[in-house]
């Protein structure tokens, strides 16, 4: 039954959020009626603005309205005249102080509501419904969507009997709760009657809510900017120059080779090797002295005997 239910309502609290955020006890009925009137007011006369959704948040004595649009310049108007008019109409309707925020949709190609509006506008302009659907699908897939389904229902092509046709590209898991499915619906008014356009766009699987994911992405961007730069590297091993004993010895050898001309000067022995060879010298000296003393004593009588030979006496 995944294709029968509204994807936004099916995933509330999992991957999607409420578009109306307020609490009411006895005034619940009045608040719901006001929300419906506010959204109808935003849709009338603002077809060219490309409004994706309207978020409403109520506090005590105040009302905040967030308009997500692909063309904020049309909603704001020249020098903010259109925004002031909308704010005045909302205050007259609700009788409360209204805070109006106009937010731009960064990637309108993968926004289901805006895609549905675009297809409906083409149908109203007598464009072939198959061409409009395929063009919208190609644009969404190039924009980063992982799957899309577009459905048109009504008197397609001016036929006497109404029917429904849909095209799908990629993967659109309608019954997977962790799937981020965006859904949009819009009606096209043609000479033959109204044609309903429905769009499902699959953007990937998520476990966290959308607000938590945006906060995490902002934190990652901030840590990338604050990451310190590393020092210069030398050699294939990736260690910094002078960071190890071998590196310092090699650097000293290079400096001596440059100064002595020709590079034949021997490199200094590392401090660790010199310390290891020093204790062996004093240990070997006493043994050498003891071995040489008897040899000198034995050679003394031999020299005296040579001196007393007849050849020496004749001389």
Swiss-Prot record:
Protein name in the entry: Small ribosomal subunit protein uS3
Gene3D superfamilies: 3.30.300.20, Ribosomal protein S3, C-terminal domain (3.30.1140.32)
InterPro entries the UniProt entry points to: KH_dom (IPR004087), KH_dom-like_a/b (IPR015946), KH_dom_type_2 (IPR004044), KH_sf_prok-type (IPR009019), Ribosomal_S3_C_sf (IPR036419), Ribosomal_uS3_bac-typ (IPR005704), Ribosomal_uS3_C (IPR001351), Ribosomal_uS3_CS (IPR018280)
Residue stretches of biased makeup (Low complexity): 265-315
Subunit structure as annotated in this protein's UniProt entry: Part of the 30S ribosomal subunit. Forms a tight complex with proteins S10 and S14.
A GO term for molecular function: mRNA binding
Domain KH type-2: 38-106
Domain of life, per lineage: Bacteria
Species in which this protein is naturally found: Frankia casuarinae (strain DSM 45818 / CECT 9043 / HFP020203 / CcI3)
UniProt-annotated stretches for the region Disordered: 211-315
Family of this protein: Belongs to the universal ribosomal protein uS3 family.
A single cellular component GO annotation: cytosolic small ribosomal subunit
Sequence ranges of Basic residues compositional bias: 222-232
Xref: Pfam families: KH_2, Ribosomal_S3_C
